[in-house]
Amino acid sequence: MIKSATLRPHVLNLKNIPMDELLKPVEIERVGDDPYWHDLCCPSCGEIFLHHRAVRVFNRDQDEEIGLETVVFEEGSHTHVSPCCDNPSLRRHGVVIDFYCEHCGEGRPEDHVVGQLCISQHKGHTGIFWRAVDNQ
């Protein structure tokens, strides 16, 4: 039996999590009457027509400055030793997925990444948030 993920509020001590103006909460929209399907909303315009591009997986031991970064994209993938400066987690593993939106951007929308969906571990908690990107 498939169970739907339940979104329940969980109180975190935000003083322990580094935040800045480049981060946004993740919003989802329920699709019709299906209790198991939800769409991500664009962090820029709020629409649901998002497409993912590159996926980056960061793997490192706790608090290590260097780790492995695996990048998967349309043309292929590669793994390399990384200083993990783009890792959304300050302490452990992290995942970053680049998204573009059909409604945002100039010219070809697929050339304009609207945000990075980040999954981060911090002191026993797994967080999910949008991170802004510079398209210049």
Regions found by a protein language model. Name each.
Residues F58-L90:
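Mixed-charge, low-complexity intrinsically disordered segments
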Residues V57-E69, L117-V133:
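Short cysteine/histidine-rich metal-coordination sites, predominantly Zn2+-binding motifs
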Residues P25-D39, S89-V95:
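Short, flexible, mixed-charge glycine/proline-rich loop motifs
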Residues M1-D34:
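N-terminal "domain-start" segment
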Residues L40-C45, C101-C104:
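Short cysteine-rich clusters marking metal-coordination/redox-active sites
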Residues E64-T70, D98-G107:
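Cysteine-rich micro-motifs
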Residues D86-H93, C104, R108:
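Exposed beta-sheet edge/beta-hairpin loop segments within beta-rich domains
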Residues I48-H52, G107-L117:
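Short, non-ligating residues that shape and space the ligands of small metal-coordination modules
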